[in-house]
């Protein structure tokens, strides 16, 4: 594993456990153990008073081509994996998305095989979902905004009965600490060191993922339903570094072109190497 603990120096105080952003360090009996979910971040070193933590023999493998292939094969995924990487301006090698387009629509294109990465900003967004993924809101005049709400969001046959329900439940989800200039969205194998990955899967595949994620740590993956796909998918993984799954909403499912049995899971990328390793260690590896 990337980091190891010197048993002669460790006093098992647990400071590293409480400060590990990946929840990758656990207590086993009287010992503190760094699990395979360690991502080389080194945060734990700064909190170890005894200087008991050092680099191990192995390093986390963040090769996106290798990880994309491994996830696809081990989970028997039928669709491609989307990667997201936030930045203040587009990378030189990535095309600026001109729009109008939906975040969920771009994801759907990549799920279905589009091999092009794009840099997505509010200017290219067709809806307010850009604010829900941490890049700020679109600009619109009052008449346009009211027309969109009344035509597609509010009232009988739409998403909410009344306008006051729009923001209800938003406080469940974390606030973004900053507004990014935009986000690169592309196939996982094309985006180096992304912040997040997101992909569709069925119930059994989700069970495989959650079992592998918690195999060494006992961590669970929370699921959400009832708000927009973008908000439910992105906020927790990006802000709190923990994976989530969700059923999506009407628009998100439509533009992602999800099948009836599919929902989506979003993972912080730094957790993916450990996830891939553990997929070979659970009960599902016996099948």
Report each predicted region and the residues it spans.
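Short, cysteine/histidine-rich loop/knuckle motifs that typically chelate Zn2+
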Residues: 9-22, 37-50, 106, 129
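Ferredoxin-like iron-sulfur electron-transfer modules
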Residues: 1-12, 23-40, 54-63
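Surface-exposed beta-strand edges and their flanking turn/coil or helix-capping segments
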Residues: 18, 25, 47-49, 211-213, ...
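Short, surface-exposed linear patches
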Residues: 26, 48, 55-56, 218-222
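Acidic, serine/proline-rich low-complexity intrinsically disordered regions
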Residues: 68-287
């Amino acid at each position: 594993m990337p980091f190891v603990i010197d048993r002669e120096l460790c006093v098992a105080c647990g400071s590293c456990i409480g400060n590990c952003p990946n929840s990758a360090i656990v207590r086993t009996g009287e010992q503190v153990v760094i699990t395979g979910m360690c991502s080389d971040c080194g945060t734990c070193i700064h909190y170890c008073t005894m200087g008991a933590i050092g680099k191990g023999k192995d390093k986390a493998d963040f090769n996106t081509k290798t990880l994309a292939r491994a996830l696809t094969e081990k989970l028997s995924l039928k669709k491609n994996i989307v990667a997201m990487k936030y930045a203040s301006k587009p990378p030189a090698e990535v095309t600026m998305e001109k729009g109008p387009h939906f975040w969920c629509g771009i994801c759907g294109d990549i799920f279905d095989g589009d091999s092009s990465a794009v840099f997505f900003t509010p200017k290219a967004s067709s809806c307010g979902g850009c604010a829900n993924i941490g890049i700020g809101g679109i600009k619109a005049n009052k008449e346009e905004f009211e027309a969109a709400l009344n035509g597609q969001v509010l009232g009988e046959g739409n998403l909410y009965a009344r306008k006051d329900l729009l923001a209800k439940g938003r406080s469940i989800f974390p606030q973004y600490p900053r507004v990014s200039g935009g986000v690169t969205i592309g196939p996982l194998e094309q985006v180096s060191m992304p912040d997040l990955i997101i992909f569709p899967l069925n119930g059994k595949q989700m069970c495989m993922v959650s079992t592998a994620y918690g195999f060494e740590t006992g961590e669970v993956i929370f699921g959400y339903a009832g708000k927009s796909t973008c908000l439910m998918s992105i906020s927790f993984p990006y802000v709190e570094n923990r994976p989530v799954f969700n059923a999506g909403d009407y628009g998100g499912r439509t533009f992602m072109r999800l099948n009836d049995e599919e929902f989506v899971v979003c993972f912080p990328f730094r957790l993916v190497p450990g996830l891939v390793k553990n997929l070979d260690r659970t009960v599902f590896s016996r099948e």
